[in-house]
């Protein structure tokens, strides 16, 4: 093969390679990927409230969040069903009553009223105000639920839930009896027990959020 033939063959091969390159579809480059990312809408948290109004409702979890919730037992709520968990409520009430009896000048009527008030406020903060769990074992699947909503996997009318509803009602009746049915103390105990211990536990308020501007913040979302 002469030198001219070799050069001609090389030029033909180069021309064929250039044509093949122009016919190929370009592979997605970094620039095209970045442009597609820019046009993609941001992912919204499905657990955000449905509206920005004062009263809102927490939406159900996705399939992935439900799997995270069922991965391990929820230690933040399973203790409610343990042996002795019910007795501790009675012990706390007795200790509160003995504590307020130590204050001089506090009558029996007011000691029972203060006991009822302390128990109701404490249980409201514990079961209905604080959200999430102190344990990091489920990828934040419970971060938007209160302890009351976590108990028994949100199953209503379980024995534990019925007990937790009946305790403040029984304490209210005892406080009213030992307050000798004083109208002012009765009204105060009735209002506090109804809206602090009974209504938040009803099915109608399940996953319900009430946001008061300047007082309560947004629901916790991880």
Curated annotation (Swiss-Prot):
Disulfide bonds: none
Keywords from the UniProt entry: Endocytosis, Endoplasmic reticulum, Lipid metabolism, Membrane, Phosphoprotein, Sphingolipid metabolism, Transmembrane, Transmembrane helix
Residues that bear Phosphoserine: 29, 32, 56
Subcellular locations according to the entry: Endoplasmic reticulum membrane
Region entry Disordered, spans: 1-57
Subunit structure: Component of the SPOTS complex, at least composed of LCB1/2 (LCB1 and/or LCB2), ORM1/2 (ORM1 and/or ORM2), SAC1 and TSC3.
Function comment: Component of the SPOTS complex that acts as a negative regulator of sphingolipid synthesis. Acts by inhibiting serine palmitoyltransferases (LCB1 and LCB2) activity. Along with ORM2, plays a role in the phosphorylation of LAC1 and YPK1, the distribution of actin patches between mother and daughter cells, and in endocytosis. Disruption or inhibition of sphingolipid synthesis leads to the activation and phosphorylation of YPK1 through the TORC2 and PKH1 pathways, which in turn phosphorylates ORM1 and LAG1 to activate sphingolipid synthesis.
Name of protein: Protein ORM1
């Amino acid at each position: 093969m002469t030198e001219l033939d070799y050069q001609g063959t090389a030029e033909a091969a180069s021309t064929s390679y250039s044509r093949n390159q122009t016919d190929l579809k370009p592979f997605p480059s970094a620039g095209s990927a970045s442009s597609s990312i820019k046009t993609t809408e941001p992912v919204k948290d499905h657990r955000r409230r449905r509206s920005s109004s004062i009263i809102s409702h927490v939406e159900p979890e996705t399939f992935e969040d439900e799997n995270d919730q069922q991965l391990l037992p929820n230690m933040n709520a399973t203790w409610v069903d343990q042996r002795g968990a019910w007795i501790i409520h009675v012990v706390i009430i007795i200790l509160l009553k003995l504590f307020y009896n130590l204050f001089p000048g506090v009558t029996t009527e007011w000691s029972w009223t203060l006991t009822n008030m302390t128990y109701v406020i404490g249980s409201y903060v514990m079961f209905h105000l604080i959200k999430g769990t102190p344990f990091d074992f489920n990828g934040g699947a419970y971060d938007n639920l209160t302890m009351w909503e976590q108990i028994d996997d949100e199953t209503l009318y379980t024995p534990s839930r019925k007990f937790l509803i009946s305790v403040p009602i029984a304490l209210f009746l005892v406080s009213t009896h030992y307050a000798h049915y004083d109208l002012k103390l009765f009204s105060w105990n009735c209002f506090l027990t109804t809206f602090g211990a009974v209504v938040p536990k009803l099915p109608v308020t399940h996953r319900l959020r009430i946001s008061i501007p300047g007082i309560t913040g947004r629901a916790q979302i991880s």
